[in-house]
């Protein structure tokens, strides 16, 4: 197969591919493997706390009572009312309505009565690992975004550096040396999942560094006003002067059904509750659209003000609001999530085989190889061990689950090098 790139360009891209790959392999493997698990986030929430009562209904007549009771419950611990309260509706994959302001949270039954608070430390730990590496959110998200950029760069450099990668898409030298077998698997898994891997890299980069992008946009076009920059992408809130002290949720939902009959509400957000400019937003899924939701705005009387244009606004806004569902496979059936998980495992294996190729090529036999093996096998083992530990009473653990995870992973990885040292 004739390449459109010169031999010098191919050698240059191969060198770039190796440097980027070795520099980012450990974190890429961690992000890919944890992301494979996070695909089943809602299913894991249900499995980790199976005793929670489930329902597919939460009638509008109970919404005001729920919001008011929530505000009363949190008032003694707060200096001021929260800026926004979210009432999350039951869905097919998570039939557990709940109310939260991002700090406290309770599940609800079909009559709006308060049930347990969420107690899913393992799912939260894995999710935090994937989204921000348990670091402060801005820093962690920026690093995750950088891994998406590196993944995208590795995909393009890998394709350029291997002119026969598509021609040899089904070539496996099963009887060859370990390095050649690893090379074949690395290249085959890469090309088989190429569209998926590219999509994951691009969407992950976008979500991870969106905070940084907003800052750049604000600096270039909005005199460092980040709120204006966000409004330019996602739409601004309307100015509301309510005529009512209470919110008419049934009327708002009835008006939504009349305006958009196919819309499926997934959450209600009451902004500035109890104030004269309180605003009700209803986020609703639209059929056959990848956008996470469309957001419809209502005044306290339940009258429709406008919608945010996430599904029919500027194309950039539609794309930005579609990345989450596309990245996590949260747009179709469980079978799609299973397919995402299979692709995620394949992507994790690409990372592993890539490093193994380099170690074999350089004939590395010292502690570096053992540390890598400890990281590869230790990461899933520690994740499973933390799942078992999460079943124990929290008082039995000297550290929280996140700290326990990193301590165990450090011990396993470092222990691999120590074992090698003792053997030699």
Predicted region positions:
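Conserved histidines in hydrophobic membrane contexts and catalytic metal-binding motifs
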Residues: 1-424
């Amino acid at each position: 197969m004739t390449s459109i790139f010169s031999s010098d360009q191919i050698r240059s891209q191969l060198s770039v591919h190796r440097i980027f790959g070795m520099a980012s392999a450990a974190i890429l493997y961690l992000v890919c493997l944890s992301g494979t698990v996070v695909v089943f986030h809602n299913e894991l929430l249900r499995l980790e706390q199976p005793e929670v009562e489930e329902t597919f209904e939460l009638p509008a007549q109970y919404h005001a009572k729920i919001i008011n009771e929530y505000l009363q419950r949190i008032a003694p611990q707060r200096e001021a009312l929260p800026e926004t309260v979210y009432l999350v509706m039951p869905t097919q994959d998570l039939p557990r309505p709940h109310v939260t302001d991002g700090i406290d949270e309770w599940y609800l039954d079909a009559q709006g009565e308060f049930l347990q608070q969420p107690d899913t430390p393992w799912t939260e730990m894995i999710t935090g690992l994937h989204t921000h590496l348990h670091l402060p959110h801005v820093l962690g998200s920026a690093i995750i975004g950088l891994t998406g950029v590196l993944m995208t760069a590795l995909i393009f450099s890998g394709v350029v550096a291997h002119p026969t990668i598509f021609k040899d898409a089904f070539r496996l030298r099963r009887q060859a040396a370990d390095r050649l077998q690893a090379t074949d698997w690395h290249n085959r898994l890469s090309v088989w999942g190429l569209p998926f891997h590219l999509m994951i890299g691009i969407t992950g980069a976008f979500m991870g560094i969106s905070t940084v992008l907003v800052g750049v946009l604000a600096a270039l076009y909005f005199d460092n006003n980040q709120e204006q920059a966000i409004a330019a992408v996602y739409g601004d809130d309307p100015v509301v002067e309510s005529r009512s002290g209470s919110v008419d949720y049934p009327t708002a939902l009835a008006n939504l059904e009349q305006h958009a009959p196919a819309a499926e509400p997934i959450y209600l957000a009451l902004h500035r509750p109890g104030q004269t400019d309180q605003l009700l937003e209803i986020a609703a899924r639209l059929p056959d659209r990848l956008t996470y939701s469309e957001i419809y705005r209502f005044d306290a009387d339940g009258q429709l003000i406008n919608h945010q244009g996430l599904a029919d606004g500027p194309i950039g806004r539609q794309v930005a609001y579609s990345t989450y569902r596309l990245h996590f496979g949260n747009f179709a059936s469980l079978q799609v999530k299973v397919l995402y998980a299979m692709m995620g495992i394949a992507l994790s294996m690409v990372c592993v085989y890539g490093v193994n190729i380099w170690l074999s090529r350089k004939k590395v036999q010292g502690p570096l190889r053992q540390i890598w093996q400890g990281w590869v096998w230790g990461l899933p083992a520690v994740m499973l061990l933390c799942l078992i530990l999460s079943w124990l009473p929290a008082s039995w653990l000297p550290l929280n689950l996140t700290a326990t995870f990193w301590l165990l992973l450090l011990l396993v990885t470092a222990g691999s090098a120590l074992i090698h040292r003792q053997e030699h």
